[in-house]
């Protein structure tokens, strides 16, 4: 049979079922205290870190060394090794890393210029297409100039204040 033990919010002691004092604050936060001493100290706003019998004090002042030693585990370190990235071999990457910054900057500038030209070209094509469409609409006699009838009054509950 397993007993569900809880911890005292002040002292850090184990509280077994049927024991302890439960305090529910006005903001619905639940506190469970081991005994009236813990409850009294909590309501008097004493800090558990300053009382030498609480778990918080013992932890801060490194009194439970045997419990802390069990937690320390060696972290496995990964050995670094070089591997190629998909789409580029290790030689290509090393070659790019070795080239001078001026060459790299020039290549970047050329690529940016090419991208800007492509964007400008697509914009010009869109403008030309739009101009053609507007020209054809005007020549058809103002097909798009038909006025719509005004909408009637809105019906239904708006749900506003009354």
UniProtKB/Swiss-Prot annotation:
Residues 117-135 have a biased composition (Basic and acidic residues). Keywords: Cytoplasm, Ribonucleoprotein, Ribosomal protein. This is Large ribosomal subunit protein eL24. GO terms for molecular function: mRNA binding; structural constituent of ribosome. Residues 71-81 have a biased composition (Basic residues). PANTHER family: 60S RIBOSOMAL PROTEIN L24 (PTHR10792), RIBOSOMAL PROTEIN L24 (PTHR10792:SF1). Residues 64-83, 117-162 are annotated as: Disordered. Belongs to the eukaryotic ribosomal protein eL24 family. It is found in: Cytoplasm. GO terms for cellular component: cytosolic large ribosomal subunit. GO terms for biological process: cytoplasmic translation. It comes from Hordeum vulgare.
